[in-house]
């Protein structure tokens, strides 16, 4: 009976030690930002998904815009061709969850989307030279949809930028950077806006040209 009691007591002590160790580990991880990493990682992924949804919405508008503009026989073909090519490039890129952890792939994707946005902006500016196109209700409706989508893209991108900023601050700050290093939480890439204005800026158009 004495040996059985000793064995039972030993098991209780072992359980208590294991439980205390688990609590201690949970406390350490929590104190070093593990839970916050989990929350911000999911938040940034959700924000990125919304960016992709809005980019896809814009890409889906392009075929109808192109088809409508083609009805204007005199429309500048170079401008139209650039829109078609930019859409093809942007939609051909494979975007996976790993894109968020690959700065090079992220940069290429951003550039392709910036080129599509720029090509569409140029098309809208050039369209001002064509009264028949401006009077086309179908084109007017598509233009409104496109402008609304561009606004939603801006909102989605800003939310993503903020979520990644919060995540990256945590990943680079002490002591949470130790947790990041131990568990493989790498800083995430974000939108570089330094040259985006140049990519998306519409050209100056001389409306006096025939």
Predicted segments, located by residue:
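A helix-centric hydrophobic-segment signal that preferentially recognizes long
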Residues: 2-210
């Amino acid at each position: 009976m004495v040996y059985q009691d000793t064995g039972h007591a030993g098991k209780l002590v072992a359980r208590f030690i294991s439980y205390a160790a688990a609590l201690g580990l949970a406390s350490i991880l929590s104190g070093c930002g593990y839970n916050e990493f989990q929350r911000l990682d999911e938040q940034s992924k959700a924000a990125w998904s919304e960016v992709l949804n809005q980019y896809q919405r814009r890409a889906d508008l392009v075929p109808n815009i192109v088809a409508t503009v083609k009805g204007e026989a005199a429309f500048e073909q170079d401008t139209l061709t650039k829109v078609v090519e930019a859409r093809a490039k942007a939609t051909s890129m494979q975007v996976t969850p790993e894109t968020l952890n690959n700065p090079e792939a992220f940069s290429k994707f951003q550039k392709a989307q910036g080129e599509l946005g720029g090509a569409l902006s140029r098309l809208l500016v050039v369209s001002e030279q064509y009264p028949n196109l401006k009077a086309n209700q179908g084109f007017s409706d598509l233009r409104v949809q496109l402008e609304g989508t561009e606004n939603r893209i801006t909102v989605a991108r800003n939310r993503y930028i903020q979520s990644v900023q919060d995540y990256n601050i945590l990943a680079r700050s002490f002591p949470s950077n130790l947790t990041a290093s131990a568990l493989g939480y790498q800083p995430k890439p974000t939108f570089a806006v330094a040259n985006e204005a140049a990519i998306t800026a519409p050209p100056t158009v001389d409306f006096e040209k025939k």
